[in-house]
């Protein structure tokens, strides 16, 4: 699925630009470098949205390790956004909104209202980690390729799957090499300790 990552200003990691990073590794990597992350349109199309991936079916508890959830996406359906909102409420995660704009007239159709002024990525990261009251919303765009194609958009969904899988395979060697440099084995990030403690209690 698509994942939104927010890193502190000045932190640019090449590994984040390479396709095919397993989500559990991505979560560790982003947290280790001081960032936050969450699933985009989590209840949307198969393969492109976290709750409709094989990884979620195998390990649904991974949702607890995200810092926020995109609760509104202007290019998704009302049903998809409602599912995302309920997901954020269920796991007590801050919900953000976005336009997911691929065309100029879609920009600004989704929004996130913060309870205080934010001037940089570090301040935004701190605010979301504090689980501050954040409001997300907007208006549905309704003019995406998916909307225009109707039922035939499933062809587009599967083509994206092949594109992403192919890209991941082609980038495997580069991902491994960059991983050794940017993501070496290190002690567990303190932010993960509550999650790991809960998993231990469940066992």
Question: Where are the regions a protein language model picked out?
Answer:
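Glycine-rich anion/phosphate-binding loops
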Residues: 17-21
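Residue-level detector of structured alpha->beta connecting loops
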Residues: 34-35, 92
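Charged catalytic cores and adjacent phosphate/nucleic-acid-binding surfaces used
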Residues: 1-14, 24-28, 45-203
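Short secondary-structure capping/junction motifs at helix and strand boundaries
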Residues: 14-16, 38
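Aromatic-lined carbohydrate-recognition surfaces of secreted/lumenal glycan-active proteins
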Residues: 35-48
């Amino acid at each position: 699925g698509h994942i939104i990552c927010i890193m502190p200003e000045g932190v640019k990691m090449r590994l984040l630009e390479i396709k095919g990073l397993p989500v559990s590794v991505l979560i560790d990597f982003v947290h280790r470098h001081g960032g936050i992350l969450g699933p985009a349109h989590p209840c949307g199309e198969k393969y492109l949205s976290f709750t409709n991936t094989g990884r979620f079916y195998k390990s649904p508890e991974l949702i607890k390790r995200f810092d926020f959830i995109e609760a509104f996406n202007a290019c998704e359906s009302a049903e998809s956004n409602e599912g995302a909102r309920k997901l954020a409420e269920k796991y007590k995660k801050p919900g953000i909104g976005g336009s997911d704009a691929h065309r100029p007239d879609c920009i600004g159709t989704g929004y996130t209202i913060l309870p205080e002024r934010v001037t940089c990525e570090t301040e935004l990261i701190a605010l979301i980690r504090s689980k501050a009251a954040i409001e997300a919303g907007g208006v549905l765009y309704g003019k995406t390729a998916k909307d225009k194609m109707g039922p035939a958009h499933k062809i587009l969904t599967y083509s994206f799957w092949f594109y992403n899988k192919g890209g991941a395979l082609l980038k495997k060697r580069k991902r491994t090499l960059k991983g050794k440099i940017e993501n070496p084995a290190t002690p567990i990030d303190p932010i993960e300790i509550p999650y790991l403690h809960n998993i231990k209690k469940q066992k």
